[in-house]
């Protein structure tokens, strides 16, 4: 451990194994707060390497609680957050639309970081039980194509660093781990990053973690596809990485001149999303969700983005997505009651 600390304090990078050892200790509560603060600060000042981030991810994955992983193909869709845009929860709603289209989605979710409402906050507004047992979540996935794994329920190793991270009041390596810590370890993923410079880092981490296929994207300082600018993409397929750019026309849509209005509260977020999922939302919001679903369909092998967008729009406008949300909530109610009665 001493050699690892000396390397960090000398502004030298750790290899993946050294990082794994360090974060195994951190996730076990074996590093004091003052030492942890110095480690995180030193790493932030010199910048964290792909190998260091990969080692940290593997350390937390090895300590996560069990989830019965399916033997069929499934994906996650997640954003890093941190863009401070306070828009509606695009990735969460895209997951529901994709499930309504027949894709299997296991979404790793957490509480809000910089937005007015995180994925778990909006799910609870829709009465989705995030404390469902792993077995119940898996059953919901099998029958309704989707389940949500709440990060604090599966990753209790983070509790040892929460106070230090709060006191530091700055982004650290921890802020970049979440999208890679899905307890089901999916073979597919779509990840949005808040900074264009993070695309290459994220896609190489996915390669290190041996994802089968994945997309990392960024557009207009947000962690999602937008309709008013260029979307920058790096895609991992068969261990090879390709990069390209997309415009709204790539999805068969027109450029929107105005940007999404900021959301001021959880209640406003919920109301807007509810109307969209009922097929009564604005065209801009419908299309914004649809293009993100199109990228999710792509990692499943549906390569035509224009056709993918049409399929997603049809599902959204039919109102079927809202019905699907209600079905998921109702299926999880039984487990919710059982939890409160034990």
Swiss-Prot record:
Pfam families: Glycos_trans_3N (PF02885), Glycos_transf_3 (PF00591). Its cofactor is Mg(2+). Keywords: Amino-acid biosynthesis, Aromatic amino acid biosynthesis, Glycosyltransferase, Magnesium, Metal-binding, Transferase, Tryptophan biosynthesis. Gene3D superfamilies: Nucleoside phosphorylase/phosphoribosyltransferase catalytic domain, Transferase, Pyrimidine Nucleoside Phosphorylase, Chain C. InterPro entries: Anthranilate_Pribosyl_Tfrase, Glycosyl_Trfase_fam3, Glycosyl_Trfase_fam3_N_dom, Glycosyl_Trfase_fam3_N_dom_sf, Nuc_phospho_transferase. One of its GO terms (molecular function) is magnesium ion binding. Pathway: Amino-acid biosynthesis; L-tryptophan biosynthesis; L-tryptophan from chorismate: step 2/5. Anthranilate 1 binds at residues 79, 110. Mg(2+) 2 binds at residues 223-224. The keyword Acyltransferase does not apply. GO terms for biological process: L-tryptophan biosynthetic process. 5-phospho-alpha-D-ribose 1-diphosphate binds at residues 79, 82-83, 87, 89-92, 107-115, 119. Mg(2+) 1 binds at residues 91, 224. It catalyses: N-(5-phospho-beta-D-ribosyl)anthranilate + diphosphate = 5-phospho-alpha-D-ribose 1-diphosphate + anthranilate. Belongs to the anthranilate phosphoribosyltransferase family. NCBIfam families: trpD. Catalyzes the transfer of the phosphoribosyl group of 5-phosphorylribose-1-pyrophosphate (PRPP) to anthranilate to yield N-(5'-phosphoribosyl)-anthranilate (PRA). Homodimer. This is Anthranilate phosphoribosyltransferase.
């Amino acid at each position: 451990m001493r050699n690892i600390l000396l390397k960090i304090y000398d502004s030298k990078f750790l290899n993946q194994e050294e990082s794994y050892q360090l974060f195994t200790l951190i996730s076990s509560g074996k590093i004091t707060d003052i030492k942890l603060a110095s480690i995180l600060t030193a790493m932030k000042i010199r910048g964290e390497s792909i190998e260091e981030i990969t080692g940290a991810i593997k350390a937390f994955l090895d300590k996560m609680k069990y989830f019965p992983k399916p033997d069929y193909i499934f994906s996650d869709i997640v954003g890093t957050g941190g863009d401070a845009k306070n828009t509606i929860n695009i990735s969460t709603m895209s997951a529901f639309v994709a499930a309504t289209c027949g894709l299997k989605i296991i979404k790793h979710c957490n509480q809000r970081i910089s937005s007015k409402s995180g994925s778990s906050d909006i799910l609870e507004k829709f009465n989705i039980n995030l404390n469902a047992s792993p077995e119940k979540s898996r059953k919901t996935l099998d029958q309704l194509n989707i389940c949500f794994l709440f990060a604090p329920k599966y990753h209790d190793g983070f509790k040892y660093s929460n106070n230090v991270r709060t006191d530091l009041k700055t982004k650290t390596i921890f802020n970049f781990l979440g999208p890679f810590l899905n307890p089901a370890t999916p073979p597919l993923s779509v990840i949005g990053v808040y900074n264009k410079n993070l695309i290459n880092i994220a896609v190489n981490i996915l390669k290190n973690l041996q994802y089968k296929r994945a997309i990392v994207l960024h557009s207009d300082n947000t962690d999602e596809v937008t309709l008013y600018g260029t979307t920058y993409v790096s895609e991992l397929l068969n261990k090879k990485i390709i990069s390209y750019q997309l415009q709204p026309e790539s999805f068969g849509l027109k450029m929107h001149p105005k940007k999404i209005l900021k959301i001021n509260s959880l209640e406003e977020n919920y109301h807007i999303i509810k109307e969209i999922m009922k097929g009564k939302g604005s065209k801009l919001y419908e299309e914004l969700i649809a293009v993100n679903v199109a990228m999710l369909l792509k990692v499943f092998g549906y390569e035509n983005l224009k056709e993918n967008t049409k399929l997603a729009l049809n599902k959204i406008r039919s109102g079927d997505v809202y019905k699907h949300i209600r079905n998921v909530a109702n299926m999880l109610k039984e487990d919710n009651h059982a939890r409160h009665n034990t």
